[in-house]
């Protein structure tokens, strides 16, 4: 695999901007965006579901459907309109979300009617390309490998924080899902707790190793009418299941086979 470089650039708000690429990034920065006021999201307890829900008032102020020439995720070029990445070019960039659902500035909220606590976590934005019109589907295998390396780097670094319990890289695709910027990008949420859906999956897996059951020849043949198995990379690494009762249309569940056997 080609060597990958990582540059850490300290922004004017004291946060780090990371540049990942096959070429070493030494470009001098241009004008930076004015530092934003720290937001303070918080968690509220939902008694009917017995789970924490995060609230962030700052989310209503996030950039929404700007003209292409004012895209905050494009490389900086117009000195009169700084962007999140103050460089003329980059391969992949990662930086803290200015309007996060979790952050280290979260404070306790005093409320006599509901149970609350700080929403201390980390939210990052991952910009896949400097090209405003790129999509993951159009990217080369080498660029996708770079993106996977970026996710892995951030996953390991974020999970090393003792306050972080779960790290989720994800991408919302389309305005129907709430996307307000069309530049190719995704996000990473580092949770201060394990989300209930994930916790349930862990409990189910620990109770019954269903992946091993499915991969057993006898069960595989009997389940053939219900499961379509697609091996990702190779059978010893991971497995993708198209289940008969998916949580979303066209959903695919990808499971690592590490520690399964």
Question: Where in this protein do the model-derived segments appear?
Answer:
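HIT superfamily nucleotide-processing domains
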Residues: 1-261
């Amino acid at each position: 695999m080609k060597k990958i470089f990582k540059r850490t650039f300290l922004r004017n708000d004291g946060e780090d901007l990371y540049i990942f690429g096959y070429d070493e990034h030494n470009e001098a920065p241009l004008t930076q965006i004015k530092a934003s006021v720290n937001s303070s999201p918080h968690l509220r307890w939902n008694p009917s579901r017995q789970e924490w829900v995060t609230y962030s008032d700052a989310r209503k102020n996030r950039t929404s459907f700007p003209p292409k020439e004012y895209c905050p995720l494009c490389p900086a070029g117009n000195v009169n309109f700084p962007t999140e990445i103050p460089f003329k070019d980059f391969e992949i960039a990662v930086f803290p979300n200015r309007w996060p659902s979790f952050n280290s500035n979260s404070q306790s909220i005093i409320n006599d009617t509901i149970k609350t606590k700080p929403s201390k976590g980390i939210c990052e934005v991952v910009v896949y390309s400097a090209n405003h019109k790129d999509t993951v589907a159009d990217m080369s295998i080498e660029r996708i490998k770079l993106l996977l390396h970026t996710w892995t780097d951030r996953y390991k670094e974020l999970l090393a924080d003792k306050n972080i319990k779960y790290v989720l890289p994800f991408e919302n695709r389309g305005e129907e899902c709430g996307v307000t910027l069309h530049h190719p990008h995704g996000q990473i949420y580092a949770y201060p707790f394990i989300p209930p859906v994930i916790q349930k999956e862990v409990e189910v897996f620990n109770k019954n190793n269903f992946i091993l059951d499915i991969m057993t020849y006898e069960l595989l043949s009997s389940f053939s009418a219900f499961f379509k198995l697609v091996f990702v990379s190779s059978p010893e690494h991971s497995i993708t299941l198209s289940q008969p009762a998916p949580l979303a249309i066209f959903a695919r569940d990808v499971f690592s086979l590490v520690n399964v056997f």
